[in-house]
A protein has these predicted regions:
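Short, acidic, Ser/Thr-enriched surface-loop or helix-capping motifs
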Residues: 166-168
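Conserved alpha/beta cores of soluble small-molecule-handling proteins
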Residues: 1-164
Length: 168
């Protein structure tokens, strides 16, 4: 249950944004493009030299079990997050991680707003740019998304629904 979910304040994802994630849809009992999502998650973890600790089939089964335990079949957005694990102390060196990876699966019912379907969304081109791949690879769904958060804030202040970020 949501009110019982807990993650350590020493988790590397919380302290440093050290983790990867995927957004997955559940529609009519099927996980949409699950193989591609898991492949990208594992490739992202590999790029960060991070072990997930489960085989892809095992992780898929955990996602399915979580949705089944919550009686969810369709119209569900799943945020799958994996962090390096718990740190001995707040410090960026991965060698001080003292636990297995933390895996979080959050399934939620998310339907588009009627106004979005009718009118679309308003975009605002923000001054915040996407980073170069050698700084923050855009192909990685990493937890550290501060530039995206800054872009959302700027778009909201401009009266837009979403930010449009340009490449460097």
């Amino acid at each position: 249950p949501r009110d019982e979910a807990k993650v350590s304040v020493f988790d590397s994802g919380y302290i440093l944004g050290d983790g990867v994630w995927e957004g997955i849809r559940l529609h009519n009992g099927k996980l949409f493009h699950i193989r591609q999502h898991l492949r990208r998650l594992y490739e992202g973890a590999k790029a960060l030299d991070m072990e997930i600790g489960l085989e892809q089939d095992e992780l898929q089964q955990r996602i399915e079990d979580t949705c089944a335990a919550n009686s969810m079949q369709s119209g569900v957005h799943i945020r799958l997050m994996v962090t390096r694990g718990i740190k001995a102390t707040p410090y960026q060196d991965p060698r001080i991680t003292i636990s297995p990876p933390t895996i979080v699966i959050i399934p939620e019912y998310k339907a588009p707003l009627a106004s979005t379907l009718e009118k679309g969304i308003r975009l605002f081109t923000v001054h915040v740019r996407r980073g170069y791949p050698d700084v923050q690879d855009q192909k990685l769904n990493s937890h550290s998304k501060l530039n995206c958060i800054t872009a959302c804030i700027q778009a909201a202040k401009a009266g837009a629904d979403e930010a449009l970020m340009l490449d460097p």
